[in-house]
From Swiss-Prot:
One Gene Ontology MF term: endonuclease activity
Pfam families associated with the record: MutH
Transmembrane segments: none
GO BP, one annotated term: DNA modification
Cysteines paired by S-S bonds: none
Coiled coil segments of this chain: none
InterPro entries attached to this UniProt entry: DNA_mismatch_repair_MutH, DNA_rep_MutH/RE_typeII_Sau3AI, DNA_rep_MutH/T2_RE_sf, Restrct_endonuc-II-like
GO CC, alphabetical: cytoplasm
The protein, known as: DNA mismatch repair protein MutH
NCBIfam families in alphabetical order: mutH_TIGR, PRK05070.1
Domain of life of the source: Bacteria
Subcellular localization: Cytoplasm
Length: 231
């Protein structure tokens, strides 16, 4: 059996990507970091994206923070998801930054959200705060595309939220809007403002917003897969 090592180039097929992701299952983050020659931080307070970066290294991801998918040649996006001991998501999942201007003519079919969620490699990771970061284990991966019903749910929420943005109501949107998709501020500090449309159609400055999948959506998705896999 060959020794486990990070992919130095992007995987050439979904099968190779999934095979590599499956090999990581059961390892701790500390073990994977040590084998990849990178330091494990004490916690994620200042390194929020560290787990994603670690898995990108192991899986040969290419996109970084660019708008295309992490595995652009395959059209696959990588999403790590912290879960509790029962495999339930512990937080919402960031999808992409929301465009607050220039949205005339935009449709669900051509949206960034749909593009990012067309094909996703979900990698659950132990997220219980009581487990030291280095000791948290990587779970079994799932390669997923939205079902017709999931696509419909996402589209309805996206259309409602985009209508509010276009109509100058971005400041009225709360995390409670949307059944499975929410829009909320995404900024490291409250001084990072971006242009948006105000209630009277005037340009305003507001916090950047991001689209996030709600926990009920990802929980149902993971439960369906892993319950089918482990009857």
């Amino acid at each position: 059996m060959s020794a486990l090592c990070p992919l130095l180039t992007p995987p050439a097929s979904e099968a190779l990507l999934l095979a590599q992701a499956r090999q990581l299952s059961g390892y701790t983050l500390g073990e994977l970091a040590a084998m990849a020659g990178i330091t494990t931080p004490k916690d994620l307070k200042r390194d929020k994206g560290w787990i994603g970066v670690l898995l990108e290294i192991w899986l040969g991801a290419s996109a970084g923070s660019k708008p295309e998918q992490d595995f652009a040649a395959l059209g696959v996006e990588l999403k790590t998801i912290p879960v509790d001991s029962l495999g339930r998501p512990l937080e919402t999942t960031f999808v992409c930054v929301a465009p607050l201007t220039g949205n005339s003519g935009v449709t669900w079919e051509t949206s960034h959200v749909r593009h990012k969620l067309k094909r996703v490699l979900w990698v659950p990771v132990e997220g219980d705060r009581s487990i030291p970061l280095a000791e948290r284990r990587v779970g079994s991966p799932l390669l997923w595309s939205p079902s017709e019903e999931e696509d419909r749910q996402l589209r309805l929420d996206w259309e409602e939220l985009m209508d509010m943005i276009v109509l100058g109501q971005v400041e009225r949107i709360t995390a409670r809007h949307g059944e499975v998709l929410q829009l909320r501020p995404k900024a490291a500090n409250s001084r990072a403002l971006t242009e948006a449309i105000g209630a009277r159609g005037e340009p305003i400055l507001t916090l950047p917003r991001g689209f996030y999948l709600k926990k009920n959506f990802t929980q149902a998705l993971l439960a369906r897969h892993f319950l089918l896999q482990n009857p």
